[in-house]
Curated annotation (Swiss-Prot):
SUPFAM superfamilies: Alpha-L RNA-binding motif. Residues 31-53 are annotated as: Disordered. This is Small ribosomal subunit protein uS4. The lineage of its organism: Bacteria, Pseudomonadati, Pseudomonadota, Betaproteobacteria, Burkholderiales. InterPro entries: Ribosomal_uS4, Ribosomal_uS4_bac-type, Ribosomal_uS4_CS, Ribosomal_uS4_N, S4_RNA-bd, S4_RNA-bd_sf. The gene is rpsD. One of its GO terms (cellular component) is small ribosomal subunit. Pfam families: Ribosomal_S4, S4. Part of the 30S ribosomal subunit. Contacts protein S5. The interaction surface between S4 and S5 is involved in control of translational fidelity.
Amino acid sequence: MARYLGPKAKLSRREGTDLFLKSARRSIGDKAKFDSKPGQHGRTSGARTSDFGLQLREKQKVKRMYGVLEKQFRRYFEEADRRKGNTGANLLSLLESRLDNVVYRMGFGSTRAEARQLVSHKAMTVNGKSVNIPSYMVKAGDMIAVRDKSKKQNRIVEALQLAQQVGMPAWVEINAEKAEGTFKAVPDRDQFAADVNESLIVELYSR
């Protein structure tokens, strides 16, 4: 399946929650009514979604949130299932460790899509080496930095300014002046994605 390139607000309305696909400069909450699905008539009143439908919807929501397509998402699940511990929590930890997501969490990109583009365009380094693979898995202690020739890009400067106003997650440490940061640790489950019910995804793939 190709990556969705249409209106971002429509995806958040479809999932009934903000997927953080738009910059915080223009809150998607101002444009999307999350209790109404896209379309002329919106959500059908009184309609009950099946268990399978709920599970599928949750998977779609997380895929769209992190910008991951089905084949790759399935691989993440299989890896999460092989690891010790809770499969659902492992899945989210893998998604959070993607380089594009870490770049977003550090505030170098105002959205995950923008962060993915920065990585793909070789604007970022990991431990001093250029990495242009958005799915690259960042490890605790890795240093992420904007390449010197990209530091003055307006979108990066503006994204960092916005991130400093909003606040950074506890698991990253940023030096905005140098446009670099450290991925201190993979976050615990209770530190992120509070509106994600990963157990539904586990149930779906366990069918």
